[in-house]
Amino acid sequence: MGEETTTAVSFRALTEADIPAIVAIEATAFYDAWNENMLRNELDNALTTYVVMESEGKIIGYAGFWLVAGEAQVTRVAVLEELRGLGLGTRLTAALVNKAWELGAEAVTLEVRESNVAAQRAYLTCGFASEGIRPNYYEDNHENAVIMWLYK
C-alpha cells in the first residue's frame, strides 16, 4: 500500500467537457470501460450524479451514483492509475457519499471485486460495511462481488 497523500484536491460536478479525460481513466480502471456515448447517457440521466476530483486543474479521478428511492447505488469510483494507493480513492468516496447525503439519500450501496482489497479498505474507512456476496458477479472472470452498505 502506498503512502497517504496530502495532495490538494477539489471536487465538482462532471461535465460533458470532462468525458475524454474520464474515458482515459476508465480504460485503466475497468475491464468493461465505458465509452464516450455511455458517459454522455449517464450525464443525461436525471437519476445520476457524477463528481470529478481535480488537482492542479487536472482530472485525477471520478465517481458517481444513481439515486433511486432514497438509495444511492455507486456505479463507478476510479482514480488515475499512477495515483492509486495514495488515499485519493478514499477522499473521492467520502466526497461522493457527502453528495449523496446532500441529495437526500438515506443509504449508499456498492459492489466491489472480492480481490480488490484496496478499494474495500477505502470503503471501510468511509464507514461502509460488508453485507454479503454476489457470487460470480463479474462477467470477465466470474469473480464474486462484495456488497457494501453505508447508512445515514
Enumerate the predicted regions with their spans.
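Conserved hydrophobic beta-strand within the GNAT/NAT acetyltransferase core sheet
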Residues: 74, 108-112
